[in-house]
């Protein structure tokens, strides 16, 4: 997939999720899906995930190959009452998601082929090595996957 195609897929997935999130009726926000997640929890989770991905993308571009990127335990974040996954209004998380995705899209559009091959080591629950190409594929689909697509 070319950089332009990646950017278009990323932008499309962003708009898909934003339309879906903004369209959830207030009385449906706390209905759990078969996996146990409510729309409210998914919206908050995606805002957190995108904030992490934005920082990771910036590090992939700016730091030397082999640098360590730090992950986070999304399951612990989901159950920390202070983070509000169960009760906080979703408007701020939707705004965070939109802003961070817009910032990431700006970066993606400026990438070149050599940027896509750069790798970083992950201090991340899923471990391994990452590169811009695989992280970009994950980010372009992630909103669709978590929103039931």
What are these regions (language model features)?
Residues 16-17, 85, 97, 142:
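Phenylalanine-focused residue identity feature
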Residues 23-27:
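Extracellular-facing binding/remodeling surfaces
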Residues 13-20, 49, 100, 107:
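Amphipathic, well-ordered alpha-helical segments in soluble domains
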Residues 9, 84-99:
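A short, structured beta-strand-centered segment in the mid-to-C-terminal lobe
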Residues 2, 38, 82-89:
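Short amphipathic alpha-helical segments at helix-loop
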Residues 28-82, 102-149:
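Short, contiguous alpha-helical
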Residues 1-16:
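Extreme N-terminal tail/first-helix region
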